[in-house]
Amino acid sequence: MSQRYRGRFAPSPTGPLHLGSLVTALASWLDARAHGGDWLVRIEDIDYPRCVRDADNDILRTLDALGLHPDEPPVWQSRREGLYAEALRQLDAAGYLYPCGCTRKEIADSLVHVRERHQTLGYPGTCRNGLHGKLPRAWRVRVPDGPAATICFDDRWQGRQCQNLETELGDFVLRRADGLWAYQLAVVVDDAAQGITHIVRGADLLDSTPRQIHLEHLLGLPTPDYLHVPVVVNAVGEKLSKQSGAQALDASAPLDALRTAGTHLGIVNQETTVAAWLATATGQWLERLRAVQDLRGTPPSSAATGRLGA
């Protein structure tokens, strides 16, 4: 891409920053700094019931203590709902949306093989051609049929990734039955509005990426480069998260936290101050990426493919 690098860290304020989220924050910060780019912070707080009071400010204070300073003031998704409404209107006007009256139980009952990915049940298309007497609950976006349903992209860490949206997922929700905006729509709209060129995040979001690329295509938005770092897991192999009991970072020991997070990314140095550690780690980052890409045969930048359905 010819434009200036712009990256971001986009935490959900469901609790304090922990090691797993720090690994993602650090990776995105290092990638931005190593490329001479800008690094932004966006608070993804549209799922109001899951948000914890003042967790957003706690996250920002912790990032500041760790020396991870954004280049622009943070933004909050809850203050940007007009952008999501306009994107939904645009998709609806183009004929890509339809109302859905199905409950999660009805969807599960209609599937022969129930499959759940990130708490999203595969959708069999029950309401694609009409509500059949049901009341509208949510808004879904159509996915392409046939060969066009396969979306592929080259991830700078994980390598080539492909997903068939039709067979693996189905038409997916953009506005939920409770009136809240779906993550997939909000993140695509915000990344475009903020001019994000490179997305660095955890590998647990790998299978969200084809959905986001599909939405980027439908909305006529640019597709960023993607890099998904391995997630940190606990002693039983579960992703380290607030839900799995991850401990809050100790902001009074920032160097220890950075060293631990760096180790998970393959970044190790012996610097004794936060500023010096981050400066050295920035130089090490591109070497680490080259080593990963050489091992996986991954190209240095990603290219997304996939055609729009008729």
UniProtKB/Swiss-Prot annotation:
How is the cofactor bound, in the record's words?
Binds 1 zinc ion per subunit.
Q: Name one GO biological process term.
A: glutamyl-tRNA aminoacylation
- Which parts of the sequence form the motif 'KMSKS' region? 239-243
In this chain, ATP is annotated as bound at 242
Indicate which residues form the motif 'HIGH' region: 11-21
| Record Gene3D superfamilies | HUPs
Residues annotated as binding Zn(2+) are 100, 102, 123, 127
Q: Give coiled-coil spans as residue ranges.
A: none
Q: Which superkingdom does the taxonomy of this entry point to?
A: Bacteria
Tell me the Pfam families matching this sequence. Answer: tRNA-synt_1c
Q: Name one GO molecular function term.
A: glutamate-tRNA ligase activity
Keyword Zinc tagged: yes
E.C. number(s) listed in UniProt: 6.1.1.-
Q: Name one GO cellular component term.
A: cytosol
Swiss-Prot/TrEMBL keywords: Aminoacyl-tRNA synthetase, ATP-binding, Ligase, Metal-binding, Nucleotide-binding, Zinc
Q: What does this protein do?
A: Catalyzes the tRNA-independent activation of glutamate in presence of ATP and the subsequent transfer of glutamate onto a tRNA(Asp). Glutamate is transferred on the 2-amino-5-(4,5-dihydroxy-2-cyclopenten-1-yl) moiety of the queuosine in the wobble position of the QUC anticodon.
What family does the entry list?
Answer: Belongs to the class-I aminoacyl-tRNA synthetase family. GluQ subfamily.
Recorded protein name is Glutamyl-Q tRNA(Asp) synthetase
Gene field: gluQ
